[in-house]
Amino acid sequence: MSRNNGNEIIAALDIGTSKILALVAEINEQKELKVIGFGTEPSSGLKKGVVVNIEATVNSIDQAIREAEKVADCEINTVFAGIAGSHVRSFDGHGIVRIKEGEVSQEDIDGVIDASKAMSIPSDQRILHVLPKDFVIDGQEGVREPIGMSGVRLEADVHIVTVSRSAEQNIIKSMERCGLEVQQIILEQLASSFSVLSNDEKDLGVCLVDIGGGTSDIVVFMGGQIVATKVIPIGGNHVTNDIAYALRTPEKEAEEIKIKHACTTSKMVNKEELIEVPSVGNRSPRQIELERLASVVQARYEELFAVINDEIGKMNI
């Protein structure tokens, strides 16, 4: 896609449980990206990253795309799309090949990556990414850039990400029904890491947590490479539900209260401050302490980060 000035444009879609986001960027002659359009629409057709109502999903995608097109003054035909959700699986793999010409080439790297995929995975899952963690040449570990190095045997430790075939196809179908060609599907937390993590952080070791509506997606880097990914089935919608239950207020109002007033620790709020909470039905609204709201939110996030900590502990890193 291109604009009237001849510059190339690209578009991306974040199809989440709570909202759909569309982003349009222009690539200038220096290969730099400049955001020129943005669209967002509430999502009601997904649950924990999986399409449960394709018509609602199509409508939300279409509205987000049209809004982005209007702001960017362009027509969007192709998109990069993120994927996440409870259907995502990940595990480690290992491949070994003989170096063909005595010096590692791209063909050798492609071959060892393919060899690492030679394992049994469930028939309802498809390999989305094979992410190299480490290369080994004739027993020498820790090789990051093997091309051009001499040796006889090349090994690769990789991290493999798979997605549900049906979940992926339903997301693709939703976009295609909006007249969009899907250029590439990418794991959400991997895409997020490109935006927010520096090379130093990846080298030293970092865990990125992308908290969505239905799930929280994590990716762990060490030594500059991805070493683990995980999807936690807890997200912002769970906080909204907790608020609705604890304060006895409708879910829509609970979401607004979360956005306007929520805090993740009760120590940060004024104990004297009150907020108005709508009641269920025709009952009059009530005044409650902001500290009470904070305690509800804090409990859920403490649970989330305890689960994340446990999962990291299981990763053997």
Segments predicted by a language model, with ranges:
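C-terminal catalytic subdomain
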Residues: Y301
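A structural feature that tracks compact, well-ordered secondary-structure segments
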Residues: D217-V219
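A cytosolic small-molecule/anion-sensing beta-strand core signal
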Residues: M222
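Nucleotide/phosphate-binding catalytic cleft detector across ATP-hydrolyzing
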Residues: M1-K19, L23-L208, Q225-V227, G236, ...
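ATP-binding/phosphotransfer module of carbohydrate and carboxylate kinases, centering on a glycine-rich
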Residues: A306-I317
